[in-house]
């Protein structure tokens, strides 16, 4: 088994450190809307706001911390890399994704721009059937353009749909962007939900062996929650 075979798994990681949630939310609200991110690849400017679930903000981009994030939240700045056994310099991009308090229902089907799929929930009070996953028909080894920010159905993905098992309100996890697309579903509007993308690590092909081992070991440990890619029947 390799990370390519795994569509989703919780990661065996240290607990999320304590941080000031209200201060964090305000940082995202104050900084996200005014950030000018070079060559940004997220869909926040492309998708109908009614379908876009997040108040997106960049804590780090191109290897540089934004708006003193690392000084205001030093415990998180360290944790974002250490949770995956990485060094701070390994991580070039950190995207913060608090769900809009007014958002309800299903967002849009998509794959994220990064290949490594390192994720975490700093807080998630809406865990049941809230992260939906559909596998691709082909076992891709690089990120296919056919599943970038797709709305509705796609001829390139299977009909089967999984609901990711969230095992904790604060959870580190892996999410495959090569062999699956996913969508966020909000069942409890107003419930606090903060996801984080740990990105800028390059391709899946160049993933560090230690990180590959962590993902595979985690899928084995959390086998009741892990979702694996299988061919369409």
Model-derived features with residue positions:
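Intrinsically disordered, low-complexity peptide-like regions
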Residues: 3, 37-40, 108-110, 174-175, ...
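Residues at beta-strand starts and edge strands
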Residues: 4-9, 116-118, 190-194
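Generic structural motif
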Residues: 16, 99-102, 125-127, 178, ...
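A structural signal for short, well-ordered beta-strand segments and their strand-loop junctions
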Residues: 39, 90-95, 119-123, 132-134, ...
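A generic structural signal for short, solvent-exposed coil/turn residues
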Residues: 86-88, 114, 124-125, 176, ...
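Catalytic core of Fe(II)/2-oxoglutarate
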Residues: 145-233
């Amino acid at each position: 088994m390799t990370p390519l075979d795994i569509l989703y798994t919780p990661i065996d990681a240290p607990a999320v450190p304590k941080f000031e949630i209200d201060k964090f939310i305000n940082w995202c609200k104050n900084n996200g809307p005014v950030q000018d991110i070079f060559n940004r690849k997220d869909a926040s400017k492309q998708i109908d706001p009614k379908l876009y679930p997040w108040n997106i903000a960049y804590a780090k981009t191109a290897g540089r911390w934004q708006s003193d994030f690392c000084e205001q939240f030093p415990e998180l700045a360290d944790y974002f890399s250490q949770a995956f056994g990485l060094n701070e310099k390994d991580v070039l991009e950190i995207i913060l994704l608090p769900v809009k308090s007014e958002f309800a229902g299903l967002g849009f089907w998509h794959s994220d721009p990064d290949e490594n799929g390192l994720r975490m929930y700093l807080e998630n009070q809406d865990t049941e059937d809230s992260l939906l996953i559909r596998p691709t028909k082909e076992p891709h080894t690089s990120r296919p353009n056919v599943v970038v920010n797709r709305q509705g159905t796609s001829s390139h993905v299977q009909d089967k749909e999984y609901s990711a098992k969230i095992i904790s309100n604060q959870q580190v996890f892996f999410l495959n962007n090569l062999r699956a697309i996913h969508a966020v579903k909000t069942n409890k509007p107003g419930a606090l939900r903060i996801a984080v993308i740990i990105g800028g690590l390059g391709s899946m092909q160049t993933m560090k062996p230690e990180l590959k081992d962590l993902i595979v070991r985690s899928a084995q440990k959390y086998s009741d929650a892990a979702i694996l890619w299988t061919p369409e029947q």
